[in-house]
Amino acid sequence: NVEFAVKYMYYLLTDEQLDEMSSGNEAKKFAKLLAYWKPRDPTPNTPYNEAMAEYFRRIDYAFFNFQTIRERDGSKTERGKIYVLYGPPDSIESSLANGTTTETWKYSKLNKTFIFSIVSNGIYKLMEIQ
């Protein structure tokens, strides 16, 4: 579904770019979507675009796995955003200290660590990036 695909490009595009990609009929939107992903395709001589497939696989995973009571679309949560942009972390550590649940996501190759804490009703907030 082209509408769905374009809608979920919000982490990669500016508002202006998203508006532009959203304009036109379905065929034009599809052409714009493919044009965006073509230079990002790691194997441009094949019909399958691995980068595009991976991005939407992450959106799908985040949608279902990071839902909260307040946000049914888990890709829009803070953990969902990090997952969509960086993929699955190399390690996840959960801890409970002083009544606060913390989840630490480590990305070794990127040398990045994201620390989330539950702030209320199971909602994780990004507290720190190292």
Where are the regions that the model predicts?
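Residues within mature, well-folded domains
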Residues: 1-130
